Amino acid sequence: MIKIRRIKPDEVPIAKQLIYRVAHQVFHDTRALEESMAYYESRGELHDMDDLQQTYFDNDGIFLVMTYDDQIIGTGAIHKIDDEICELKRVWLLFEYHGKGLGYRMMQELFTFAHEKDYQRMRLETDRDHQTRAFDFYKRLGFYEIPRYSDNEDDVAMEMIL
């Protein structure tokens, strides 16, 4: 049975591993998964997950996991930018669960949270070249491109009115 719930602190390493595993496939990383994970950890790629309480929960945000039979199969989060704008973060789903409407279910939970917090707009960044499926998914949800708001030149910024 599929469930979506708030992440527990002891699940952070599992969620990170899931994200690295999916990213490893999406970006066609030729290194061994463990080597790739160690490299990205050393660069602090998922540093926002090291203190979920401060980064998300104490700052009008949320970090959710999707589980199937108590195994984490997906993640999704919202981070506060300001009182009116939140940022969609860490939306990842294992490949074997793609195409089943589960991404939409996660997004509906995140949209509900954003509405409850009275956010007016939601932003995100994604890599259009490597994450084409995610880019198309976000466009179908109503996101549109906006000028980049970070210095990551590989990413495209998107936004939607909630």
Give the residues covered by each predicted segment:
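Acetyl-CoA-dependent GNAT
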Residues: 6-89, 94-95, 108-109, 113, ...
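Conserved GNAT acetyl-CoA-binding A-motif
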Residues: 114-126
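Hydrophobic secondary-structure block in the mid-to-C-terminal portion of proteins
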Residues: 136-142, 146-157
